[in-house]
Amino acid sequence: MKPTLVLVGRPNVGKSTLFNRLTKSRDAIVADMPGLTRDRHYGHGKLGKKPYLVVDTGGFEPLVKEGILHEMARQTEQAIAEADAIIFVVDGRSGLTPHDKEIANKLRRIDRPVFVAVNKAEGMNSGMVEAEFHELGLGEPNAISAAHGEGIRGLVEMALESFPEPEEDEWHSDSVRVAIVGRPNVGKSTLINTLLGEERVIAFDAPGTTRDSIEIDFERGGRKYVLVDTAGMRKRGKVFESIEKFSVVKTLQSIEDANVVILMVDAQADVSDQDAHIADFILQSGRALVVAVNKWDGLDAYTREQTRQILQRKLKFLDFAKFHFISARDNIGLGNMFRSVDSAYAAAMAKMTTPRLTRVLIDAVAKQAPAKHGLFRPKPRYAHQGGSNPPIIVVHGNAVDQVTDSYRRYLEHTFREAFKLQGTPLRIQFVTAKNPFADKDKK
């Protein structure tokens, strides 16, 4: 399982800049998706062979007792408690503040490794910048510059030092792992209870991680599934009750561990930033996806149409996924939803032969050639599969690294149609043929 690094600190110390620096390796994958939210709070990173997750908690005000700042502090404290390591960001130019000391008092009581990152240290003597932050009592401070990338690698190496490299093959189960994620009170527990009651299975708690994600084995239509739940469910007889609280870390880890994610959205509430952030993370993770719009039965015809339009506008970057309008309580639409889970899983694991991929590519180019880039027109020549879960298609040719974003989307749409890849993100990588005369020209 990927370790989770949580960034904490008072407002305006550069946490977001550090977050962008730590997650830059994945930004390019989703940068050309229209409508994608850029205000990320959760992301992926990788140092060598060690992948990790990053959570940016926003400004931490631990002493505020009410209002939105109190709610932010509560969420931050929960993320801290569930983190694998904490990076405490302070401002080297402002120096040590009473606010920093308040946060340090909180962090000293947490049984997690804490690494103090003294940001904005560019052009300054690192020893002098670090000196006053020893007073925090959280170990050796580390001078960095998030804006310039200075000291970042060493900081992350220390944070990840105690975590092993991941196993080569993490997918060892015959069961399809389905994560059900969404905001509190959206109906995750109701959905699981309805599914379990429908199948008349005896469910059990299986705390599989230090964060006690709950895994529920069940069978449907002769196929085995594992439901990964983040709602804090506990067994009561043959049904479950839930006190739903939103846990960032549990949600991110359950997405990472899943084959397919069901993102639940409340039809009777507006699509929130939290919904969009989680949808963005699912896309970054490359997980197959089904969107379940719950409590649909409580809307009249006019409100349903308005809700559809809002969903299309706010979640348009999820156009590869099937949307299902359901009632988890009344078991309306769940059969079709689970058929989409199966088809999304099949799409994510699809095997595509090189000859057929190449035929589809050549036909697509014949119908619509790439636009010229300067004096040259990119010439895609053949394609092969580079991976699955999500499917990766590698396109080779001359100057193909110069194709436009719109042409990339055209090819993605073409491959999706040809191979029935609905329900899964699709990555297309372009590899430009090396000019055999390039080295000779230099001699």
Curated annotation (Swiss-Prot):
Domain KH-like positions: 350-434
Residues involved in GTP 2 binding: 182-189, 229-233, 294-297
UniProt-listed Gene3D superfamilies: 3.30.300.20, P-loop containing nucleotide triphosphate hydrolases (3.40.50.300)
Residues reported to bind GTP 1: 9-16, 56-60, 119-122
Entry's Gene Ontology molecular function annotations: GTP binding; ribosome binding
Superkingdom of origin: Bacteria
The protein's name in its UniProt record: GTPase Der
Organism the protein comes from: Dechloromonas aromatica (strain RCB)
Native organism taxonomy: Bacteria, Pseudomonadati, Pseudomonadota, Betaproteobacteria, Rhodocyclales
Gene it is expressed from: der
